Regions:
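Single conserved hydrophobic/aromatic residue that forms the stacking wall/gate
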Residues: 152-163
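Acidic/aromatic-lined carbohydrate-recognition and catalytic surfaces
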Residues: 2-154
């Protein structure tokens, strides 16, 4: 049995969780401040929706930079502290990683759009016919395999992620 088989997961959207700056937007520091409460609730794993740099046109799933924290939410140092504080309480972290799409602001998208024959050209599917692939299902109602956990060994990384 894996640790996540009977774990209690708690999902938090950082931007709407707890504001620590007075700007009306939740922050990673706000999440840190509530960890004792989450531990008291019996949470084993905190699940964070995307908090990466994004224009926020799709609730943060439109990621512009996978290596940066959205500036309204905090810094990479705040994220590192969150991971350390979770682990100090015996809790784990799961994040959403939207690898199958990016923001239109992402450098790869911009490069592909500018030069579809260039090195990033095949990172995206370009076409003018919306009915070109009518048989493709966008939502897979018969499977939940997309909600998998990938386990990591590094303390600096997430304990798992949802792809």
């Amino acid at each position: 049995m894996s640790w996540h088989d009977n774990a209690i997961f708690y999902q938090a959207l950082v931007g709407s969780y707890k504001d620590t700056t007075g700007e009306g937007v939740g922050t990673l520091r706000g999440v840190i401040e509530k960890l004792d409460y989450l531990k008291w609730l019996g949470v084993d794993c905190l699940w964070l929706s995307p908090f990466y740099a994004s224009p926020l046109r799709d609730d943060g799933y439109d990621i512009a930079d996978y290596y940066s924290i959205h500036p309204d939410y905090g810094t990479m140092e705040d994220f590192d502290e969150l991971v350390a504080e979770l682990h100090a309480r015996g809790m784990r972290l799961m994040t959403d990683l939207a690898f199958n799409h990016t923001s239109t602001d992402h450098p790869w998208f911009q490069a592909s759009r500018t030069d579809p024959e260039g090195p990033y050209g095949d990172y995206y599917v370009w076409g003018d016919d919306p009915l070109r692939y009518p048989e493709i299902r966008i939502i897979f109602t018969d499977t939940e395999t997309s909600n998998c956990c990938l386990l990591y060994t590094s303390d600096a990384a997430d304990d798992c992620c949802r792809v």
